[in-house]
Every structure is written in C-alpha cells, then in structure tokens.
C-alpha cells in the first residue's frame, strides 16, 4: 500500500483463511504470518510468492468466524530469534520453525491453545496458554 495515497501496489490471494488478529513478522526478505486454517506461511517480500508453509495440527478451539473442522489455526504473531521463528498455535503447540526453509525444528505441547504472542527477552521466551499457565524457557 502506498502510504501517502492508500493505493494498493501489490496483492496476493491465498487458498487460506486469514481471519486472524495477529500481526505478521516483516523482515527484509519475507512476510511471515499465521492463518486460521492452514498453519504458518512465509511470503517472499518483493514478489509475494509463497516461500514456505509450515503445517500445524487441527485446532483444539475454533476461533475463526464461520469456521468448521478441520482447521489448523494460528492466532499468534510470530517472533524471530537467531534464524528461528517461534509461534504458538490453536493446536496447543509452540513451534520452532527454521526461518529460511520453513522446516519445523521443534515443537512443545501444552495441552491448551496458545493465543498470545511469545515474549522474547535475551535467550528466554515467555509463553502463556489458554489454560492460564505461564511458561518461561531458555532457548538453545
């Protein structure tokens, strides 16, 4: 979007439901975001081509309007640290995704959806789940 005029300069249609309230992670080379039904996407910033998609598991809770099963929702904003994208999902997992390739490097199950964005401070991550738990992890 052209900031001065509001004119759309570029747009991309995806075969995904983007009814999420999270903020995308915008880097020099990519735009990374969650979807309401198909996991996490990374688009090449200059071309808007899909660079990768990381699949999440079916949601434990459906939050997208007019949604039905199966959904693989990601309502949180991604954060990046040392080439890894961290993002919580509606399936109850915290995902660690290689930012370059989209390969899921690790995932941790909480048993309740993760609807809040992960906070990163130094080598520590703070994660809250929908059951009211707060976790603090040291990243490797």
Spans of model-derived segments:
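Short loop/turn segments that connect beta-strands within beta-propeller blades
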Residues: 2-6, 44-48, 98-102, 139-140
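C-terminal structured "cap/appendage" subdomains that terminate the fold
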Residues: 86, 95-97, 103
């Amino acid at each position: 979007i052209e900031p001065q005029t509001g004119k759309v300069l570029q747009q991309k249609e995806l075969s995904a439901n983007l009814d999420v309230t999270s903020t995308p992670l915008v880097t020099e080379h990519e735009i990374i975001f969650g979807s309401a039904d198909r996991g996490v996407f990374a688009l090449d910033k200059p071309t808007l081509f899909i660079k990768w998609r990381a699949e999440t598991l079916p949601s434990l809770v459906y939050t997208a309007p007019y949604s039905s099963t199966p959904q693989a929702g990601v309502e949180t904003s991604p954060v990046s640290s040392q080439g890894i994208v961290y993002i919580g999902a509606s399936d109850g997992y915290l995902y660690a995704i290689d930012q370059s390739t989209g390969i899921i490097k690790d995932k941790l199950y909480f048993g309740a959806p993760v609807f809040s964005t992960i906070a990163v401070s130094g080598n520590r991550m703070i994660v809250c789940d929908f059951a009211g738990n707060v976790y603090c992890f040291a990243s490797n």
